[in-house]
Swiss-Prot record:
It comes from Metridium senile. Keywords: Acetylcholine receptor inhibiting toxin, Cleavage on pair of basic residues, Disulfide bond, Knottin, Nematocyst, Neurotoxin, Postsynaptic neurotoxin, Secreted, Signal, Toxin. It comes from the Eukaryota. One of its GO terms (molecular function) is toxin activity. Negative results: does not show activity on rat TRPV1, human TRPV3, rat TRPA1 channels, the human ghrelin receptor, human neurotensin receptor 1, rat ASIC1a and ASIC3 channels. This is Alpha-actitoxin-Ms11a-2. The presence of a 'disulfide through disulfide knot' structurally defines this protein as a knottin. Disulfide bonds join 26-41, 33-46, 40-61. Residues 1-24 form the signal peptide. The keyword Secreted applies. It is found in: Secreted; Nematocyst. The keyword Signal applies.
Length: 66
């Protein structure tokens, strides 16, 4: 049981080192985001960039148009 808890903690520490933005509370410009989570920082919105083929797979935080 203790080894399972240790493993979960180790995975969490590795993830927080690799993906600091996901633990900062909000996502910065051009960070990957999920539209329904509203996780981009103030002034940014989660949009799917259009790469010409009309199918941008990754959603990113971009500046909101005024």
């Amino acid at each position: 049981m203790a080894s399972k808890i240790f493993f979960v903690l180790a995975v969490f520490l590795v993830m927080s080192a690799v993906l600091p933005e996901s633990f900062a509370g909000c996502k910065n410009l051009n960070s990957h985001c999920y539209r329904q989570h509203r996780e981009c920082c103030h002034g940014l919105v989660c949009r799917r960039p259009n790469y010409g083929n009309g199918r941008g797979i990754l959603w990113k935080c971009v500046r909101a148009k005024k």
